Amino acid sequence: SSILASLRAMSHDHSHEHVDPAGLVHEVATRLAAVGQRLTQTRRSIVEALAGADRPLSIPEILTGGAGLAQSSVYRNLSVLERAGVVSRVVTTDEWARFELSEVLTGHHHHLVCSKCGAVDDVRVPDDVEADLDRALAVLAERAGFALQHHRLDLVGVCGACR
């Protein structure tokens, strides 16, 4: 089918490469202020680590990338950043949650999640396929009496490294 062809043709998306650093800092500071918080150096370091990654990161990966960050501080600050809508948690199949900048900052995308190693890759669906998916999900939601606001799609399988 044409949808399968489009999906096969899609490439892994380095969705954060187009984020403007100055605009990002301003948007993050604004979102934090809206929930009564400030953009501290620790929060800035976490946001910079996530913005510089081409996929969602685990806390150990954030700690590796952020000079001098304490694990307890990263946990606390990720929670604040989540509440402010700056960071989203990606549930995976291993023991580590992964974190990424929220879609309001990076744009809508989906995830490929490896059921063996827990790796997560960002992937963007072509606009025409995304529109078809939106319509199909809206119909399913309506039939269930559910008011759909948005969707998140994680495709679970086995990555190339584990195959």
Where is each model-derived feature located?
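N-terminal leader segment of winged-helix/HTH proteins
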Residues: 2-38
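Short helix-capping/hinge SLiMs at alpha-helix to coil transitions
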Residues: 35-37, 51-54
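Short capping segments at the starts of secondary-structure elements
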Residues: 41, 53-58
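Pre-recognition alpha-helix immediately N-terminal to the DNA-recognition helix
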Residues: 44-49
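A short acidic, leucine-rich amphipathic alpha-helix
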Residues: 61-65
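Basic amphipathic alpha-helical segments that dock to polyanions
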Residues: 74-85
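Non-DNA-binding regulatory cores of transcription-related proteins
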Residues: 84-163
